[in-house]
């Protein structure tokens, strides 16, 4: 056998559904990499003979390998911050009131319109570094803090550039319909026209987005407006997804599922009909515990129904300055368990296998199996549940991306 690298003295949480052990675990395992892919994975005692003198061998000190983490929902390219709104909320103002009074998303829009690409890139790079340190190897980044053609394109270009210059892979999502900009305050339909007829074609022409998202909510876009944007995106061949049922139930998830959305995200107010629709269409349910925590929500997403209907649950950071200023994926694993009562195994599946599905990249990443991309992390832990049990101890000790060891 001729391999580029071999890992031994490891246990592996493959997260493969084809291995019946919890976490798809293989204890006393070995893994071999060739040309950026997993060439062999299994029990150490079954490892075929290979040229030990010509092959770099990495010893995992009996820690655990997991798939590289995938943060499938972030807004990490933005300028400014909203600490002032945090203070207002602690004095009693609600997230919705602040948004209705011209703060919220619009205040970040103002900061992004003023920032140049270099500034946004540097801010984004620092945030990507923070996620990468915790074992994230793929991230989704949304626009949505521009709300005019120039700034929406600027944010998406920066997101694409980050993907080119950082080892973390970046999937981009056009979220032009994130909020109604002040210029269209009294004519939101005209803004939706702009998103569909002018922004979307330019985003497509420059190949700036892999998917399209909308914020379907009383303080943002109606069900009918959301359907128009998602239909246009789908017709253009892009993946679709939705911020839905975060503060109320407008039926967005059900509609998006019927259009074949990859995921619906937040979904605190989703009901059983909605869950059924997700299960029928294979749409993922993305749980965002950071926003749930930071907005001090009390309405939990319908976790038990999602389990019952076997809807794949995704866990993501939703990193953004307003509702989840928490740039940590591992913290989300902990919160998914403590606040939303996922099992540690469900939480990890939400940041690996199911997150890959939500981004449409499940054929390449998200589980450790032969033929998959060699994106994985070595953790200094004695059981995979430790990933969501403890936080802040820096247990990610090595990251391999596309078969290359990344020095962090
Ligand atoms: O995912 N819900 C809408 N959008 C973001 C929040 C954006 C903001 O407040 O800046 C979210 O929570
Ligand atoms: Fe979000």
UniProtKB/Swiss-Prot annotation:
CDD domains assigned: Imidazolone-5PH
Annotated binding of Zn(2+), by residue: 73, 75, 243, 318
Binding locations of 4-imidazolone-5-propanoate: 82, 145, 178, 246, 323
Pfam families xrefs: Amidohydro_1 (PF01979)
Gene Ontology molecular function, alphabetical: imidazolonepropionase activity; iron ion binding; zinc ion binding
Keywords: Cytoplasm, Histidine metabolism, Hydrolase, Iron, Metal-binding, Zinc
Domain of life of the organism encoding this protein: Bacteria
Binding of N-formimidoyl-L-glutamate, residues: 145, 320, 322
Cofactor: how and how many bound: Binds 1 zinc or iron ion per subunit.
One GO cellular component, as annotated: cytoplasm
E.C. number(s) listed in UniProt: 3.5.2.7
Biological or metabolic pathway of the protein: Amino-acid degradation; L-histidine degradation into L-glutamate; N-formimidoyl-L-glutamate from L-histidine: step 3/3
Function per UniProt: Catalyzes the hydrolytic cleavage of the carbon-nitrogen bond in imidazolone-5-propanoate to yield N-formimidoyl-L-glutamate. It is the third step in the universal histidine degradation pathway.
Family indicated by similarity: Belongs to the metallo-dependent hydrolases superfamily. HutI family.
UniProt xrefs under NCBIfam families: hutI
PANTHER family: IMIDAZOLONEPROPIONASE, IMIDAZOLONEPROPIONASE-RELATED
Protein's name in the database: Imidazolonepropionase
Species annotation: Shewanella piezotolerans (strain WP3 / JCM 13877)
